Curated annotation (Swiss-Prot):
Keywords of the record: GTPase activation, Lipoprotein, Membrane, Palmitate, Phosphoprotein, Signal transduction inhibitor
Record's function text: Regulates G protein-coupled receptor signaling cascades. Inhibits signal transduction by increasing the GTPase activity of G protein alpha subunits, thereby driving them into their inactive GDP-bound form. Plays an important role in the phototransduction cascade by regulating the lifetime and effective concentration of activated transducin alpha. May regulate extra and intracellular mitogenic signals.
Organism: Mus musculus
Listed InterPro entries: RGS, RGS_sf, RGS_subdom1/3, RGS_subdomain_2
Name of the molecule in the record: Regulator of G-protein signaling 16
Length: 201
C-alpha cells in the first residue's frame, strides 16, 4: 500500500493514473455515441440497453461487495484500485480460490493447491496475503488431503479484510465517484420504458 508516499511518490502517482485510465475505459463504454446517423432502430436500441445495463452494473458496485465481486467490470476496476494501494494480492488470491473450486481432477486439485499455497499463503510468498499464523497453519494442514474447501478459511478472512478495508476506500475514490456520477446520469437520461429513437438530422 502507498503508506510511504514520500518514498514512492512517482510509483504511487503512476498507479493512481493507471486506475483512472482503466476506469476511463469503462466511462467510454457507458457513453452513447453522439453520432447515431446510419444505424438502425434495432441497433440503437440494443446499444442503448447495453449502455443502461453497464450503468446499472456500475451503480450496483456500491450496493454490496458481493455485487462488485460478481461483476467482471467491477472486479477489473477494483483490481486496478488495489494496485494503487499495492494490495492486489488479496483479490488475486480470492479469485484463484474461486477458480480452484471448479477443479474436478484430484491430481490437478492437489497440484493447484500447492501452487496457490506457495504463491499466496506460505511465509515470504511472492504475493503473501495478510492472514494470521493459525489460519496459515490450518491451510497448510489442509493441503495434506486437498479438497475444494481447503482454502475456505483463508479465502474468507481475505474477503472480510477487503470488504472492511479496501472496498470502502474504493467507493470513496475520485475515479469511482466520477464513474458512478456518469452512470447515474446515463441511467436517468431516458425513460425506463422503450428508449427514444435516435434522431437523423
Amino acid at each position: 500500500m502507498c503508506r510511504t508516499l514520500a518514498t514512492f511518490p512517482n510509483t504511487c502517482l503512476e498507479r493512481a493514473k493507471e486506475f483512472k485510465t482503466r476506469l476511463g475505459i469503462f466511462l467510454h463504454k457507458s457513453e452513447l455515441s453522439s453520432d447515431t446517423g446510419g444505424i438502425s432502430k434495432f441497433e440503437w436500441a440494443s446499444k442503448h440497453n447495453k449502455e443502461r445495463s453497464f450503468s446499472e452494473d456500475v451503480l450496483g458496485w456500491r450496493e454490496s461487495f458481493d455485487l462488485l465481486l460478481n461483476s467482471k467490470n467491477g472486479v477489473a476496476a477494483f483490481h486496478a484500485f488495489l494496485k494503487t494501494e499495492f494490495s492486489e494480492e488479496n483479490l488475486e488470491f480470492w479469485l484463484a480460490c474461486e477458480e480452484f473450486k471448479k477443479i474436478r481432477s484430484a491430481t490437478k486439485l492437489a497440484s493447484r493447491a500447492h501452487h496457490i499455497f506457495d504463491e499466496y499463503i506460505r511465509s515470504e510468498a511472492p504475493k503473501e496475503v495478510n492472514i494470521d499464523h493459525e489460519t496459515r497453519e490450518l491451510t497448510k494442514t489442509n493441503l495434506q488431503a486437498a479438497t475444494t474447501s481447503c482454502f475456505d478459511v483463508a479465502q474468507g478472512k481475505t474477503r472480510t479484510l477487503m470488504e472492511k478495508d479496501s472496498y470502502p476506500r474504493f467507493l470513496k475514490s475520485p475515479a469511482y465517484r466520477d464513474l458512478a456520477a456518469q452512470a447515474s446520469a446515463t441511467s436517468t437520461s431516458a425513460p425506463s420504458g422503450s428508449p427514444a429513437e435516435p434522431s437523423h438530422t
